[in-house]
C-alpha cells in the first residue's frame, strides 16, 4: 500500500500487515534517497523525503525557501543553495496558504529572477498555488490532489501556518 496514493482509514488487520512490512532489519540493505538539495555542502533535501524550514514570524523563511526553489528551477546554485534534480523530476509545486494572490505573485517573480529566468511568463516547471481563500481542510485536499496529479514532481513547498498540518487530528 502506498500511503501517498491511498490515505484512507485502515483496519486493525491491515495495520498489523503494514506494521510487519515496515520493520527494518540490520540484515537488509536499503537504498539511499538521491540528495537533491544542499547548502554549504550539507544535505538539506533528498528525493522522496520531508524537510521543514521553521522559524519565528518575519525571520525570512519565505526568502530562504525562494532561494531553494530558484536553485531547483535552475538546477544549479542560488545563494549557496545547490540543487541537483534528476532529469525526469524537474517539476516544482509551491503552495502558499497565507498570502494573497498579489503577494504570491511577487514571491513567484522573485523566485524566477533569482533563478535567472524570465519573470514575465509562466515557467513549465513551477506551479504556484495561492490557497488563502480556502478553509484549512480545503487547502489540504487541493494540495493533495496537486501533488498526486502533477507528473515529474521533484519538490513540494508548503508555505503556511503549522496548525494546518494538524487538521483532522
Descriptions of predicted regions:
Residues 1-6:
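Long, basic/Gly/Ser/Thr-rich N-terminal segments
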